[in-house]
Structures are given as structure tokens and as C-alpha cells.
Amino acid sequence: MQQQINPEIIQEISDDLRVQVLTEALPYIQKWRNEIMVIKYGGAVVKQDADIIKDILFLTCCGFQIVVVHGGGPLINEWLKQLNKSPQYWEGIRVTDKVTMEIVEMVLAGKVNKQLVGSINANGGKAIGLCGKDANLIVAKASSKKELGLVGEIEQIHPQVIDMLLEKHYIPVIASVAASHDGTTYNLNADVVAGELAIKLKAKKLIFLTDTKGILADINNENSVISTLNLKEAKNLANTISGGMIPKVNACICAVENGVEAAHIIGGKEKHQLLLELLTEKGRGSMIVV
């Protein structure tokens, strides 16, 4: 049984726009139908979830198999501050001590994960929330950078539970928390999780929804989005990107090098950017290909 979308979502679109969108989208729908796409839902855009959820459900109605990986950094910081604990970073990565790890797990695997699952289901979808611990989906190990504390790296991925859910037309929603073989809980970088899952699942596309419109040629001009890059061009960005864009671009490069057909970085704060990027010729964000 395919996902059933809330009819109100379609009614919001004018007749002329419906025809235009469907005509342009049809070749892309035919090409990607039944293919897996991994969408990384950045913590900075979680508050814009209503429109993004509609886009995700539209894609599932078209037959795309969607896997969602989410972050939640801003909300983690809010909870840390409520407990009078200041967020700590080392080389741009969150330092995760035992108390911080408990908050990270509570926020990501609890609040944010269930919020997204609830939103999808309320709009007629069928979502199930997971974290790396569930069915040993992701086995973690300690980072080689001891300064980071309980920040982990991916040791193994066992995707069978995702395969089972996709076969039954569910949308897996995954929080980036996992345990090691000895049961220690680790905080994983959600960008890395999304990229590695895309490779393991043999996804055709990896999509990052962020608070910027894409990869910018000029960091001071938000409209200077680079539409398409090959791997060589993406690797040459090392000196022009910074902060949270670095792990996203690196994950895109790794995914494309390992069989993912295309990786996208797009803005999540404006309506329907996901559909415009995937189902139109012009697109809206940045796409990295071989």
C-alpha cells in the first residue's frame, strides 16, 4: 500500500501550477520511481517541518523510497542552557561528555525524532522512528579524537531493518545516536550517518536540507548558489567552505565516489525547495555528481 497524502496539501496548489508541475516532473518521477533517496534533515530547519513534510509525502506518493536522517543541534543547545550547561566545541564538533550525551540522546532519539514521525503520520504518511541502537542499525566506536569525549564514528551498518520498512512502504526516520559493541552510547555526526546510509542502501540520491540555499560561490551572497559541481570541483572547495558545510560536502563527495548517483545540498527554509530541486530541470540548490 502506497503512502496516502492529505488532500489539503494538493488543494493548496492552483490548477495551472498543478499542470505545469506535473508535466515537468513526470520524466523525473518515471526515472526515480522505486529508487531510494536519503534525506538529511538539518536541525536548523526542523522548525520549518510542515512544508518539508508535505514535499516528502509527495515524493513517497510518486513511488520514491525515502529515508530521513535528522539532526537537532539547536534544540540540544537549548536544553543544555536550561540545565546551566554551556555547549562546548572542539574544531567545530560538539564535545560530548556523559551529561551532554544523555541530553543528546533525549533530544534526538526522543523529542525531535518523535516530532518528525508525528508530523509525517498526521499528514497521512507512515513513518517509524529509529536510532542507531535499534536492531543494531549502526554500531559505533569511539572517535580517534579523544578530546571529543562520547563522539563516535561508524564501525558497521546493518540496514536490514530499513530494507524491511521500505518494503512495507514505511518512511524510516533515523536519529544519529548509536551504541558500540560494549553498549557505550555515542553521538554521531548526522551528516556522516546520512552519507554512509546512502552508500549502504545503494541510494540513488543523497539530499541535505540546510539553512543555506546551497554551496555558495561567494559566502557573502546567498544567491551565488553553485548549481552543479563534479567531484573535482567539489574537492577544490576546501578553502572556500567552513563550519557545518564541511561535513556535508565531504559526505556528498564520499557518497558519489561510492555509487550514489547525485548528492544535493539545498535550502530548507523556503517552501517546496525539495520538490523544485528533484523534479525540475533547473533545480534550486547545489548538486554534486561524478
Swiss-Prot record:
Top-rank taxon, per record: Eukaryota
Reaction catalyzed: N-acetyl-L-glutamate + ATP = N-acetyl-L-glutamyl 5-phosphate + ADP
GO molecular function term, any single one: acetylglutamate kinase activity
Protein localization: Plastid, Chloroplast
Function: Catalyzes the ATP-dependent phosphorylation of N-acetyl-L-glutamate.
NCBIfam families: argB (TIGR00761)
Organism of this sequence: Cyanidioschyzon merolae (strain NIES-3377 / 10D) (Unicellular red alga)
Pathway assigned to this chain's UniProt record: Amino-acid biosynthesis; L-arginine biosynthesis; N(2)-acetyl-L-ornithine from L-glutamate: step 2/4
The name this protein goes by in its record: Acetylglutamate kinase
Gene (name only): argB
EC number: 2.7.2.8
Annotated residues for binding of substrate: G72, G73, R94, N187
Site (Transition state stabilizer): K40, K248
Keywords on record: Amino-acid biosynthesis, Arginine biosynthesis, ATP-binding, Chloroplast, Kinase, Nucleotide-binding, Plastid, Transferase
InterPro entries named in the record: AceGlu_kinase-like_sf (IPR036393), AcgluKinase_fam (IPR004662), ArgB (IPR037528), Asp/Glu/Uridylate_kinase (IPR001048), Glu/AcGlu_kinase (IPR001057), NAGK-C (IPR041727)
Entry keyword Ligase: no
Assigned GO CC terms: chloroplast
Native organism taxonomy: Eukaryota, Rhodophyta, Bangiophyceae, Cyanidiales, Cyanidiaceae
